[in-house]
Each structure stands twice: as structure tokens, then as C-alpha cells.
């Protein structure tokens, strides 16, 4: 498979910034590069938007993924809220018929368990450019709330960062029937039933 990993924001666009100035753009880059390495170790092809703290437009991201004919588009973000107690993982997809809808459910289930954060579930939106303009099945992962002080403190721990990366990597690998990164992890893989082959998972 060829994966497109989109690390949100970058450069002049820091994305969400915590009370202690932890940047979303830096956080997802660190996590994303670990995911890239995990996938490549399993002989998966990976294309990225960026591998440094650089800015790229939303149109650049989707155009590059489409030009590369990637099989799946995975966009990584950290969430933020004025409610500083908000916490949990959620994944956005274009609609419920998406081929990656069940993958999104699995990511929520597994990441919630692996880093002990609430499962906020799969959400639907046709407004996200990276979901709307990509030709391949796409998801946008909101890993957790960088605005939550507990989450922000955890992000300083390299083991926690690695746990996030491994959890997401393993959900992706399980989706395409590849071995998981760490045998100590157990993963939920929901396949489901479909009426036609175009909406079936494979």
C-alpha cells in the first residue's frame, strides 16, 4: 500500500498552541515521523506532506496525495478547546460510506485504550478540505486535546509519544493485514458487512 501521511500545520501555521506554548505542528510531526518509520519497516510505501517545520497549503497537501496516487490519506492533528478539561480521541471521515469508516472506529478504540483517553468516536464532515479534495479514502485524526494540561504534560514523555505512534501504526497495519509493531498490543479490527464490493473493506 501507499500511504499519504499529512502532518497538520507547520511553519508559519503552528495550529493549536497550549498554555505552555507546545505547538500542535511540532507534536504531530514528531508522532507522524514515528508512524512513517513503523509503516516503512513493514514494507509500506509512505509519502508525507512535510518532514520539517515547514508550511504547505491545504491544496498542496491534497494535490500531492492525488498526484502520487496514494491508497489512503491520513491527516494528524491535535485538538483544542476553550474547555480546558476536554480530553479524548476522535477521527473525522467524509461520510459513513467511506471505506475507512471502520478503520476510524478502530483507531478511536485502540488509541483510547493505549493512552487511556476518552473515545469521542468517529465524526462526519464534508467541510474538511483534506477529506473533500482527496481522491483516495481519507481520515483526519484528532489525537487528543493539547489544550488539556494533563495531555500537554504527557506529550513531553517520549514513551507516551511512541505509544501514540505505535497505536495508530498498528491500527493502520491491521487494516491492511500486516503484522503489528509490538506484540504486547492487542487491536480491535472491525470489518462489518456491506451490500456491495465498493464499500467493502480490504
Each language-model region and where it sits:
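Generic anion/oxyanion-binding catalytic loop in active/binding sites
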Residues: 17, 54, 188-189
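Gly/Ser/Thr-rich beta-alpha loop segments that engage phosphate groups in nucleotides
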Residues: 10-13, 17, 81, 90, ...
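Short glycine/serine/threonine-biased micro-segments
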Residues: 6-9, 13, 73, 86, ...
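Short glycine-rich His-centered loop
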Residues: 1-21
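Solvent-exposed beta-strand motifs enriched in subsets of small alpha/beta binding domains
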Residues: 180-202
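Active-site-proximal helix/loop segments of hydrolytic enzymes
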Residues: 3, 22-182
Amino acid at each position: 500500500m501507499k500511504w499519504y501521511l499529512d502532518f497538520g500545520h507547520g511553519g508559519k501555521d503552528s495550529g493549536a498552541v497550549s498554555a505552555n506554548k507546545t505547538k500542535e505542528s511540532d507534536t504531530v510531526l514528531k508522532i507522524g515521523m514515528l508512524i512513517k518509520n513503523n509503516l516503512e519497516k513493514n514494507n509500506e510505501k509512505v509519502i508525507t506532506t512535510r518532514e520539517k517545520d515547514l508550511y504547505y497549503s491545504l491544496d498542496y497537501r491534497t494535490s500531492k496525495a492525488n498526484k502520487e496516487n496514494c491508497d489512503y490519506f491520513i491527516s494528524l492533528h491535535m485538538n483544542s478547546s476553550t474547555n480546558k478539561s476536554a480530553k479524548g480521541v476522535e477521527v473525522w471521515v467524509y461520510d459513513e460510506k467511506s471505506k475507512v469508516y471502520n478503520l476510524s472506529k478502530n483507531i478511536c478504540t485502540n488509541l483510547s485504550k493505549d493512552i487511556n483517553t476518552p473515545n469521542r468516536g468517529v465524526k462526519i464532515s464534508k467541510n474538511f478540505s483534506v477529506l473533500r479534495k482527496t481522491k483516495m479514502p481519507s481520515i483526519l485524526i484528532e489525537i487528543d486535546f493539547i489544550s488539556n494540561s494533563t495531555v500537554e504534560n504527557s506529550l513531553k514523555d517520549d514513551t507516551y509519544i511512541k505509544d501514540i505512534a505505535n497505536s495508530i501504526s498498528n491500527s493502520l497495519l491491521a487494516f491492511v493485514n500486516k503484522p503489528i509493531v509490538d506484540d504486547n498490543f492487542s487491536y480491535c479490527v472491525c470489518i462489518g458487512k456491506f451490500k456491495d464490493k465498493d464499500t467493502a473493506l480490504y
